[in-house]
């Protein structure tokens, strides 16, 4: 038995297909979902969502949101989603290096929060390109 996943952003339905397994970046860590999973709703952090079909794994950078798991259907609502095909590897690598440096140099509370947010976004995109 498989899972039906639908990933939606404010702009579009980003992904809608049958999968065998999904790993979600929740606020408390990664959470795997297989068929016949118990119903739940969970908040998603900025990170990499992994989707497995029979053939291989697909990585998607998600920028926070939530997921609903119910009766082998997973509905994922996120602020933004990007796949490997839509990310420029050079730009992602540069953004990751810049965000890391900015986070290390942040001093004030507000500056640290903003730098951490930018770092998490850049890291997710960098991880998706497989660097």
Curated annotation (Swiss-Prot):
Stored InterPro entries: ATP_synth_F1_dsu/esu (IPR001469), ATP_synth_F1_dsu/esu_N (IPR020546), ATP_synth_F1_esu_C (IPR020547), ATPsynth_dsu/esu_N (IPR036771)
SUPFAM superfamilies in the cross-refs: Epsilon subunit of F1F0-ATP synthase N-terminal domain (SSF51344)
One Pfam short name: ATP-synt_DE
Keywords per UniProt: ATP synthesis, CF(1), Chloroplast, Hydrogen ion transport, Ion transport, Membrane, Plastid, Thylakoid, Transport
GO molecular-function terms, A-Z: ATP binding; proton-transporting ATP synthase activity, rotational mechanism
Compartment(s) of residence: Plastid, Chloroplast thylakoid membrane
Membrane topology: Peripheral membrane protein
GO CC aspect terms: chloroplast thylakoid membrane; proton-transporting ATP synthase complex
Name of the protein this chain belongs to: ATP synthase epsilon chain, chloroplastic
Function description: Produces ATP from ADP in the presence of a proton gradient across the membrane.
Species annotation: Oltmannsiellopsis viridis
Domain of life where this protein originates: Eukaryota
Family (UniProt): Belongs to the ATPase epsilon chain family.
Gene behind the chain: atpE
